[in-house]
């Protein structure tokens, strides 16, 4: 399942990631990561599927001052920009059918490279149409989502990572047993024997429940770790079978994009290193 956030004007992708399930927590995770990387936005516009209208998502965004609007049922034209982006996803999946990909991690690694090197940097027809509709000339080479995003003069508003993290935390009540433990989602967690019999408030990230924060009045929060492995624990999920029905050795297109991606990162690292050297050189002559 692919979850994506797209900037309405520039068509720039704020976050896009494949997950092994289609749940509300996946959408929350996408919002969380997009806000951390690109800052707070004023308003979000989502589908009306149940995973997009969860109370938790609405509350999390409200805590950060973000208003959520929902598309009306059977109004496909209102989601046109993200639907057109899905055609790009289809192109990627065709390449993935060629590549030898077995894990979700590898799928997302290649997807990030594809986005950064192909979609974000390619001229976008929708941006051209937008400007031409207002009789504004567009360069012959067009304008890419990345270029249009960078042309926006509005200042990005970043929020402290701790504040954002807390906004997306889930909360539930639990009772601590005589051994100082509590159960959650089929696992046991160790809190403290001093809380035996107490009703506590737990806070957790639904996509990472290896550690859960336990809150009790008059005490510092406790980080409770999982102490038992449930029988239903699973390894990292594989890529959906539908994507890998044909698995040759590699995709030449994705290989080329990855090579360009690595080269750009290397050049950026060299530039930073050279800049640091120049500063040291200048300081040495002062």
Region spans (language model):
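RNase H-like DDE/DDD metal-dependent nuclease/strand-transfer catalytic core used by mobile genetic elements
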Residues: 2-113, 256-263, 267, 276-279, ...
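A short linear-motif detector with a strong N-terminal bias
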Residues: 22-25, 30, 47, 73, ...
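Active-site-proximal acidic segments at structured loop/helix or strand boundaries
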Residues: 91-189
């Amino acid at each position: 399942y692919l979850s994506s956030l797209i900037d309405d004007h520039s068509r720039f992708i704020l976050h896009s990631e494949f997950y092994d399930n289609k749940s509300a927590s996946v959408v929350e995770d996408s919002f969380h990561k997009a806000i951390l990387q690109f800052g707070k936005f004023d308003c979000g516009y989502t589908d009306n599927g149940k995973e997009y209208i969860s109370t938790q998502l609405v509350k999390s965004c409200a805590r950060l001052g973000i208003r959520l609007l929902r598309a009306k049922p059977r109004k496909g034209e209102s989601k046109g920009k993200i639907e057109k982006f899905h055609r790009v996803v289809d192109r990627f999946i065709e390449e993935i059918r060629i590549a030898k990909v077995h894990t979700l991690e590898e799928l997302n690694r290649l997807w990030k490279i594809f986005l950064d090197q192909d979609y974000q940097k390619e001229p976008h027809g929708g941006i051209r149409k937008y400007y031409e509709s207002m009789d504004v000339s567009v360069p012959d080479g067009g304008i890419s989502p990345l270029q249009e995003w960078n042309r926006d003069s509005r200042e990005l508003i970043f929020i402290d990572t701790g504040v954002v993290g807390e906004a997306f935390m889930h909360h539930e009540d639990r009772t601590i047993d005589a051994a100082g433990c509590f159960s959650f989602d089929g696992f046991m967690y160790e809190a403290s024997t001093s809380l035996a019999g107490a009703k506590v408030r737990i806070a957790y990230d639904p996509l990472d429940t290896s550690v859960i924060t336990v809150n009790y009045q008059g005490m510092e929060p406790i980080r409770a770790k999982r102490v038992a492995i449930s029988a239903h624990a699973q390894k990292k999920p594989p890529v959906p079978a539908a994507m890998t029905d044909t698995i040759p050795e590699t995709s030449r297109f994705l290989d080329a994009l990855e090579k360009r991606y690595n080269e750009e990162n290397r050049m950026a690292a060299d530039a930073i290193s050279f800049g640091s050297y120049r500063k040291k050189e200048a300081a040495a002559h002062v």
